[in-house]
Amino acid sequence: MSGSKPDILWAPHHVDRFVVCDSELSLYHIESAASPSSELKAGSLRLSEETTATLLAINSDTPYMKCVAWYPKYDPECLLAVGQANGRVVLTSLGQDHNSKCKDLIGKEFVPKHARQCNTLAWNPQDSNWLAAGLDKHRADFSVLIWDISSKYTPEVAVPAEKVRLAPGDSETCSVVTKPLYELGQNDACLSLCWLPRDQKLLLAGMHRNLAIFDLRNTNQKMFVNTKAVQGVTVDPHFHDRVASFFEGQVAIWDLRKFEKPVLTLTEQPKPLTKVAWCPTRTGLLATLTRDSNIIRLYDMQHTPTPIGDETEPTIIERSVQPCDNYIASFAWHPTSQNRMVVVTPNRSMSDFTVFERISLAWSPTTSLMWACSRQLYECTEEGKGSSSLDRDIATKMRLRALSRYGLDTEQVWRNHLLAGNDDPQLKSLWYTLHFMKQYAEDIDQKSSGNKGLLVYAGIKAITKSSMGTTESFRHSWTGSDRQADIVHYSSEERCLALQLCGWRTKGADSDMGPFLNSLEQEGEWERAAAIALFNRDIRRAIQILNKGASTGKGNLNLNVVAMALSGYTDEKKSLWREMCSTLRLQLNNPYLCVMFAFLTSEPGVYDGVLYENSMAVRDRVAFSCLFLNDAQLSRYFDKLTNEMKEAGNLEGILLTGLTKDGVDLIESYVDRTGDVQTASYCMLQGSPSDVLKDERVQYWIESYRNLLDAWRFWHKRAEFDIHRSKLDPSSKPLAQVFVSCNFCGKSISYSCSSVPHQGRGFSQYGVSGSPTKSKFTSCPGCRKPLPRCALCLINMGNPVSSSPGASKSDEKVDLSKEKKVAKFNNWFTWCHNCRHGGHAGHMLSWFKDHSECPVSACSCKCMQLDTTGNLVPAENVQP
């Protein structure tokens, strides 16, 4: 201080007043400015665009000030203690206060035995009559003196001249107190001190080489730790066991409950520190200032939960703020306004500054957005959110599909597209393709001895390549037409299988299109049904379908016009009918109506107008090509179409690629485009060979979906997915993660299950399944020592909680056709990893519903509270 280094103190009970201390004490009143451009009042200083400060009083009666402390109580309101260079502590005031108590205290002096500099002062926050002073070292005196300001002065005691040589005025008129209430810290220097809020008689002092905690109830004992960081000790107002101190450019953070070493040491600064201060309105926010700097560094100490016994350091976010352009001499946090401080420069210019909080956003796995700023927490909702499922984010779609058990129907595979909402044509095509693949693969495996069924999952492209050289061509005339022109089409066993996978044919040798066309008519797909009938040379059926479609209530009257046009079909190349149809077909909006005329007007073997109509379903284009293209044309067309599907990530292309490496490439493009790892996972698990399932991309999609289910707290759904995965891919079944071993011999208790045939694996070996008499394992199979007893029912583990009603001898028989049952959860072994007590899971759950402590006598372990995940509730029944 001493005129060259001003300091700032906020009034404890007046949030609009502060004092600047250097060679004199200046009291200021801070108020809001009318406007940034308004003129200042006489004697006012502009602190910021919003605030100004007005000088209220000046006190220059106390020279050689080294430290100042403001009286913590409301009355008297302007009482300050000033520590001087000679060790005296003087009580003074700012302004006029006619309170008799204040008049008795003002001017009172507290004089040590030997003169030396007073470094720090601290009022006791609870007993405000106690004032602690920290002095420099003297070989024959104490350095920590605690004065009682209410004690009577002793004018009869002679004061040596060396004590009063710096005192102003006549020393005989002063109220002098020379006997402190407590004397501490002999033969050492005190550089900083503060009272501990948790106890009014605990004082923390930064001595010359250690931090010491003095207990005034027993002054002969102290707790201390050797350290160089003894300057600027200050207690966190929000966490009374946390203390900060500094030395040179380094700050140490202490926990008084574990005082052996700092719990944290902040990054060392290149320049010496001059001040550290905790923010009174913000938990864990520490501000530091270095010499000759215009930067204040802030350290935000995050509160992150750590496991019991873990000594990991807390997370710290460091940032710097610049309140002004000039060097900063000191700063002070505002006592009530959040993150607000006033800084002062060496030339006494001041600035009112607010540290703006970092805005943090949190986006939950359920797409809820939270915005935290300062003490406010905002929940953000999207305006004008579309109600259509097509407008939803893919994460929302996947979450809803998971709730509907999407992908888990392995019998009627096609139904999975209904579980997905039946609003995505690509998903519909995918699941129908997988359904047909499963259906025909099972039929082929039953009819043949080899693994020809795997060829079905390789896709139509691979199937048709296997028939190269065996394809036969046939000429057929139109059905239901007077024209006898022949149409060339191609057939083979593999092409017939391809048509079945496309849905154009049913199982068996019967090639009747009737059932398929009827199903299309029921779904209202009149144009598609008519086109497929036409492609199968039944022009009369196509006309009938169009007329039927036009006659329905919601039918398109244009269908009658198209039917009339079809009825006039002629195969003459230069006819007016062919010329007009070639021109006008491009004006039709429906792609199937367009390709009907493209087919009729095409040259034999040249059907580009049909094959490259992108609005037409891929399965229909593939089926058409299998009928009318020869082997060479078919191979070239499939190669080109496959590349298009892979680049676009179109799931309809799975019909061509199958669940092969090409299929993985296609799914990769689909996932890159949509982010739908859910469909990718279920699709690849449906029938992919093991080498494809081991592809790192497939494994990444599967693990991503599992993590997504966990993030949504869909733990049951994730378990169902794991079970589904292990059925379709036995190699993915994980090893047992938990096993129970005997305390005496160390052998696994699960060995006892090996003598019982067909015993369920996993946790069933630790519980009771099947017959209550056959499955009792109450002793270790290795050493025959009894298993531990349940802490509640006192029955040896291995016994069921209760016998299953209706159990009979028939229960002892094992039905291999049924799934192996897992033991009931209530019978599982359960134990606490802390106290090692436990019992039947059902009993433990019932106990901890009403109790917090362990059921074993004299054990105070709070077992359930140690399991943080036990407090989480599955969210599978919560709708978004």
From Swiss-Prot:
The residues bearing each WD repeat, given as ranges, are: 60-102, 113-157, 185-224, 226-264, 268-309, 399-441
Detail which positions bind Zn(2+) 2: C793, H840, H843
Q: How is its activity regulated?
A: The GATOR2 complex is negatively regulated by the upstream amino acid sensors CASTOR1 and SESN2, which sequester the GATOR2 complex in absence of amino acids. In the presence of abundant amino acids, GATOR2 is released from CASTOR1 and SESN2 and activated.
User: Where does the chain bind Zn(2+) 4?
Assistant: C835, H837, C854, C859
Zinc finger (C4-type) residue ranges? 740-786
Return the GO cellular component terms, semicolon-separated: cytoplasm; GATOR2 complex; lysosomal membrane
Which sites bind Zn(2+) 3? C832, C835, C863
Zn finger region (RING-type): 787-868
**What does the annotation say about its assembly with partners?**
Component of the GATOR2 subcomplex, composed of MIOS, SEC13, SEH1L, WDR24 and WDR59. The GATOR2 complex interacts with CASTOR1 and CASTOR2; the interaction is negatively regulated by arginine. The GATOR2 complex interacts with SESN1, SESN2 and SESN3; the interaction is negatively regulated by amino acids. Interacts with SAR1; the interaction is direct, disrupted by leucine and mediates the interaction of SAR1 with the GATOR2 complex to negatively regulate the TORC1 signaling upon leucine deprivation.
Q: Summarize the protein's role.
A: As a component of the GATOR2 complex, functions as an activator of the amino acid-sensing branch of the mTORC1 signaling pathway. The GATOR2 complex indirectly activates mTORC1 through the inhibition of the GATOR1 subcomplex. GATOR2 probably acts as an E3 ubiquitin-protein ligase toward GATOR1. In the presence of abundant amino acids, the GATOR2 complex mediates ubiquitination of the NPRL2 core component of the GATOR1 complex, leading to GATOR1 inactivation. In the absence of amino acids, GATOR2 is inhibited, activating the GATOR1 complex.
- Protein name, entry field: GATOR2 complex protein MIOS-A
Which organism was this protein described from? Xenopus laevis (African clawed frog)
